[in-house]
Curated annotation (Swiss-Prot):
Produces ATP from ADP in the presence of a proton gradient across the membrane. The alpha chain is a regulatory subunit. The record marks 363 as: Required for activity. One of its GO terms (cellular component) is proton-transporting ATP synthase complex. It is an enzyme of class 7 (translocase). Keywords: ATP synthesis, ATP-binding, Cell inner membrane, Cell membrane, CF(1), Hydrogen ion transport, Ion transport, Membrane, Nucleotide-binding, Translocase, Transport. ATP binds at residues 170-177. Its main location: membrane. One of its GO terms (molecular function) is ADP binding. It is a peripheral membrane protein. It comes from Thermotoga neapolitana (strain ATCC 49049 / DSM 4359 / NBRC 107923 / NS-E). F-type ATPases have 2 components, CF(1) - the catalytic core - and CF(0) - the membrane proton channel. CF(1) has five subunits: alpha(3), beta(3), gamma(1), delta(1), epsilon(1). CF(0) has three main subunits: a(1), b(2) and c(9-12). The alpha and beta chains form an alternating ring which encloses part of the gamma chain. CF(1) is attached to CF(0) by a central stalk formed by the gamma and epsilon chains, while a peripheral stalk is formed by the delta and b chains. Belongs to the ATPase alpha/beta chains family. It is found in: Cell inner membrane. This is ATP synthase subunit alpha.
Amino acid sequence: MRINPGEITKVLEEKIKSFEEKIDLEDTGKVIQVGDGIARVYGLNKVMVSELVEFVETGVKGVAFNLEEDNVGIIVLGEYKDIKEGHTVRRLKRIIEVPVGEELLGRVVNPLGEPLDGKGPINAKNFRPIEIKAPGVIYRKPVDTPLQTGIKAIDSMIPIGRGQRELIIGDRQTGKTAIAIDTIINQKGQGVYCIYVAIGQKKSAIARIIDKLRQYGALEYTTVVVASASDPATLQYIAPYAGCAMGEYFAYSGRDALVVYDDLSKHAVAYRQLSLLMRRPPGREAYPGDIFYLHSRLLERAVRLNDKLGGGSLTALPIVETQANDISAYIPTNVISITDGQIYLEPGLFYAGQRPAINVGLSVSRVGGAAQIKAMKQVAGMLRIELAQYRELETFAQFATELDPATRAQIVRGQRLMELLKQEQYSPMPVEEQVVVIFAGVRGYLDDLPVEAVRRFEKEFLRFMHEKHQDILDDIREKKELTPETEEKLKKAIEEFKAVFRV
């Protein structure tokens, strides 16, 4: 058998021509230092700020946080203990996205959207980046629809509208979370989807909250995002942004959403920790210079969209914890200046048995008044004035021995109104019930009752209204105002009930 050298050459040439090596170019870097939830990486020259990266050997994700001359500071989203010096890091060329949509309702997830409740995987069809630019003025419309909390003191005097940002502020153990949870429970049947973001809390406390939401049937329209105290600071830092993205999905599809951030003090501490580890220069209270921007870019995403964009809304209820009533500290003043009002809870009132312990004098709602229903406006205007006068006279009355009848009458009414504003936890009240009860208080129908009988009067009066005068309640709910005819009927109903009420 003869071998033809020409044929061999031809075959080799064809093989060489058809050979095509696919060169896969990837921007990678090497870990030069790792610890405390951050990694320093050499290389990754083209990486962008906030870009997602992957540690190839472990599969853990990270985010480019600091871009320096000779290295990149990366915050690790998850367990960093398996990452070693020399490991490879590659760019993913996208920013963090979280799953969003109806599939997350009723679920407990971490800030990356991974389930924590043992109910199996979440098959979400939609994803959203956790950081987006807040919509501009042109894309918004004024807040005009109420978000009923079911809490008498708030819905009457510090009303919240859909698309508003209302801060809940106070010392530890004064009932801040209780107000937020009651508000979520009260959204049942209101078409509002809720996101509860727990930042830096004990797992036992979070488990208790989830259990209460389930018990009152609120979990079916709520997503709980958890970055507990035992989670890395990196997850606590991204948690509120992830929760906001989940809420935005509903807002941008023409629906209403409510996001509770519990709480932003711990969020600021987590961000301070990351910034100090990254050697960013510390400022006041050792917080970095951009701590204001951290919260403003989050809370500016609360929005009431105009009709062209579907008219949806995202309402934010951030919570901030104060130390010894100091609302002039750094983080509280920052968040007060960003939000549209604050609900201030006071330990003194809490321990005196006034619960919810809302200081009505220091609390304010800057845009919610426009969203309040007319019926509530009609009765609540009087309530705020009566209580303001009562607060002034109360201190004076402690020292004065003899009071004129007018002053005594104002103090008597003020005491009964304060008693009327007390409310049990987990028992939000429909707005029509609030209107009739407050009407009875401000029109003086409780003045001749002993203070200790006010709560019982309220309970029995509402039962009486449902049994005998349901039409009045229906009328207020449907018309959203107290017409002269309804007012007359209500006065007669109160007098009818007072005739049979036994003190």
